[in-house]
């Protein structure tokens, strides 16, 4: 509609919808950059985070975090950790 609340506006925009992703461990920052999609090994199963995701805090189990940006894929193995998502900023603390 014209009330500015239509979700279609942001998705049809030519601007790229990227999120900021930061993965940190006790050793320091493992990854800091942009991502269009991030997959996590959650306690109840794997889940994906896409732009405009609702705020979230979730525990992570052993597995692999996978992320994608401009067609390039990356991954980070983890033992345990947690993720916080807020305003297209994904903060991950892992061991």
Predicted regions mapped to residue ranges:
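Short, Lys/Arg-enriched N-terminal segments with co-localized hydrophobic residues
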Residues: 1-18
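Compact, glycine-rich, soluble single-domain proteins
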Residues: 18-95
């Amino acid at each position: 509609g014209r009330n500015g609340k239509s979700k279609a506006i942001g998705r049809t925009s030519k601007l790229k919808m990227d999120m900021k992703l930061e993965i940190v461990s006790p050793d320091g920052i493992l990854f800091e950059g942009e991502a269009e999609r991030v997959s996590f090994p959650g306690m109840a199963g794997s889940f994906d985070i896409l732009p405009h995701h609702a705020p979230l805090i979730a525990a992570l189990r052993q597995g692999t975090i996978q992320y994608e940006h401009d067609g390039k894929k990356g991954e980070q193995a983890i033992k345990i950790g947690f993720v916080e998502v807020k305003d297209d900023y994904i903060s991950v603390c892992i061991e």
